[in-house]
Every structure is written in structure tokens, then in C-alpha cells.
């Protein structure tokens, strides 16, 4: 019988919606009552894996992450479970497990440690280089991207990945200021240029006017959409029959891809007619969770 998990209202980098993921696993005795292996496709700091390993004593986890700093952080956090965790330096779109697993989880959000580290260049709250690479081994960073793209291509990128209606105006301003300066000094310098494209009243709202553009640049630098599309195609093949896949997304582009994949993939049974969202308590404790959406599917 198909279970709709949309209405479960359960419910520190703080991993989001951990209780909801644990709840979804508990709905399937086939999974939770047996010795099992899982894949944490976005290991990050190890927050989700920690709670899973703590709850299920026989569970073994394969954790994937292409960020070496995240892997080191996870290694420290999961020290007490080191015999049950295997950490692999890989993006989820490039991985192929040796054996099928009982469940897969993926949190598509940017790790808080990445955001809060100025040297990573993900945020304009603290000044840092225009980097935004999750994997430091890739060559293209945000600065290179801005310099090499044409004004039109940059505008298209900002619109496509940021849903930014002022994309053309922003792109024109970015390229104009770049030509005059020769180089942006850092994330705050770029954010200042972007903010200048907005009316004064909009520059001081709760959401900074550069937020959507920074999101678009980060997505492009890390090929996030292409990687997610590939992951959604291959992940069902990682599962045992009856196994589940849980994915947390944070913006409309990701959520739309996950929703369409879960509904349209003949291999999967969609368990969430509507996405599960964080409860009020979690949002109060972790404001970054407010835009999270969890969708779950089961392999037929």
C-alpha cells in the first residue's frame, strides 16, 4: 500500500529535516528492521549520517562529497561510527555503488560552513574572493565565469538559475563595472554592484538583492543542475526493490526537477504528493531551513 508522507509534521552546520527523514524510513519495516546499507549522497558535515547511524545500530553508510573540507568535518563528527561509515571523494553524479542499498538521501543545500567561510566566496555577508567552488580542483570559479561570459550569456544564466527578473540590467552593470575596475575586489564588491540595479526601497529588504544572482553563479560554477539531472537518472538503480530515496531541495529549480523525476520515472512510486516542509520549531531554530522541501520516492 502506498503511503503519502506529505502530511507528516515531525520535527549543527544544522542538518535540516532529519526527523522527517528518520520518520520516512520507519514507515518501511523492510528497511528499518534489517541490516542495511545506505548512501548519503551529500555527506557535508555528516549531520544526517550521524543521526541515522545513531538510530540504526546495524546501519552502514557510504557518504559522498567532493568537498575535501566537508569530508574532513564529517570524518571528525562520525569518529565514533568509523567502522560503519565509508567516505568517498565523489560528486553524486559520478558514483556507482558496488551493491544496491536500502535507501538514499541527498540534501542539495549549501553547507553552512561553506557559506560562513569567507575564503570560499559563497556569501556577500563576509567579504571573500569570488570563488564559489565546492570542489577546489575544478578550474572555473565565479570570477572566471563573470570575466569570460558575454553580457547576454551572463544575463541568461542569472535568469535561468536565479529566477531574477532584472537579469539583463544586472548583467549589464556587472560587465560595465568590471570593465571600469578591471577586477572585482571580492564578494561584497560584486554584491554592491548588483544592489545598484534595484530601487532604493528594495536594497534593504530581508532578502538581499544580490541573493538570486549569487545563487545563479554558484549553480553555474558547480554544474549543479546538470549533476542533479544525472543523479536523478542513476539513483533509482542504486536501490534494492522497495528501497526509498529522500531528497531535500532549497530552490524552485531543484524542487521542480525532483518532483518531475519522482512523478515521471516508471521505476519509482512517488510518496509525497506535496513536498514536506520544516515545521515551525525547526524554522525558528534554523532560519536557513525555511525554504527546504523534502520529497520521497520508493523503488517499485
From Swiss-Prot:
EC number: 2.1.1.199
Listed InterPro entries: RsmH, SAM-dep_MeTrfase_MraW_recog, SAM-dependent_MTases_sf
GO cellular component term of the entry, any: cytoplasm
Pfam families from the UniProt entry: Methyltransf_5
CDD domains found in the cross-reference section: AdoMet_MTases
UniProt-recorded Gene Ontology molecular function terms: rRNA (cytosine-N4-)-methyltransferase activity
Reaction(s) this enzyme catalyzes, per UniProt: cytidine(1402) in 16S rRNA + S-adenosyl-L-methionine = N(4)-methylcytidine(1402) in 16S rRNA + S-adenosyl-L-homocysteine + H(+)
Binding site residues for S-adenosyl-L-methionine: 46-48, 65, 92, 107, 114
Alphabetical keyword list: Cytoplasm, Methyltransferase, rRNA processing, S-adenosyl-L-methionine, Transferase
Subcellular localization, as worded in the UniProt entry: Cytoplasm
GO term, biological process aspect, one: rRNA base methylation
Function: Specifically methylates the N4 position of cytidine in position 1402 (C1402) of 16S rRNA.
Family: Belongs to the methyltransferase superfamily. RsmH family.
Protein's name in the database: Ribosomal RNA small subunit methyltransferase H
High-level lineage: Bacteria, Bacillati, Cyanobacteriota, Cyanophyceae, Synechococcales
Gene for this chain: rsmH
Amino acid at each position: 500500500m502506498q503511503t503519502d508522507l506529505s502530511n507528516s509534521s515531525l520535527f549543527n552546520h544544522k542538518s535540516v529535516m532529519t526527523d522527517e527523514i528518520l520518520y520516512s524510513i520507519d514507515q518501511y519495516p523492510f528497511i528499518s528492521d534489517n541490516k542495511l546499507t545506505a548512501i548519503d549522497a551529500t555527506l557535508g558535515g555528516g549531520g544526517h549520517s550521524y543521526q541515522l547511524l545513531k538510530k540504526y545500530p546495524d546501519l552502514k553508510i557510504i557518504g559522498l562529497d567532493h568537498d575535501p573540507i566537508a569530508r574532513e568535518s564529517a570524518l571528525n563528527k562520525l569518529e565514533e561510527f568509523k567502522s560503519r561509515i565509508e567516505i568517498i571523494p565523489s560528486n553524486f553524479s559520478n558514483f556507482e555503488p558496488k551493491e544496491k542499498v536500502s535507501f538514499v538521501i541527498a540534501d542539495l543545500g549549501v553547507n553552512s560552513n561553506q557559506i560562513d567561510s569567507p575564503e570560499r566566496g559563497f556569501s556577500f555577508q563576509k567579504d571573500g574572493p569570488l570563488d564559489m567552488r565546492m570542489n577546489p580542483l575544478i578550474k572555473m570559479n565565479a570570477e572566471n565565469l563573470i570575466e569570460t561570459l558575454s553580457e547576454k550569456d551572463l544575463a541568461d544564466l542569472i535568469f535561468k538559475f536565479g529566477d531574477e527578473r532584472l537579469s539583463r540590467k544586472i548583467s549589464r552593470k556587472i560587465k560595465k563595472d568590471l570593465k571600469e575596475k578591471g577586477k572585482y575586489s571580492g564578494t561584497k564588491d560584486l554584491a554592491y554592484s548588483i544592489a545598484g540595479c534595484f530601487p532604493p526601497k528594495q536594497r534593504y529588504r530581508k532578502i538581499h538583492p544580490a541573493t538570486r544572482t549569487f545563487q545563479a553563479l554558484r549553480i553555474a560554477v558547480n554544474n549543479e543542475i546538470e549533476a542533479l539531472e544525472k543523479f536523478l537518472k542513476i539513483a533509482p538503480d542504486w536501490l534494492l526493490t522497495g528501497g526509498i530515496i529522500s531528497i531535500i531541495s532549497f530552490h524552485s529549480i531543484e524542487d521542480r526537477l525532483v518532483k518531475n523525476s519522482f512523478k515521471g520515472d516508471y521505476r519509482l512510486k512517488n510518496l509525497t504528493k506535496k513536498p514536506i516542509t520544516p515545521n515551525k520549531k525547526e524554522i525558528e531554530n534554523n532560519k536557513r531551513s525555511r525554504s527546504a522541501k523534502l520529497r520521497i520516492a520508493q523503488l517499485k
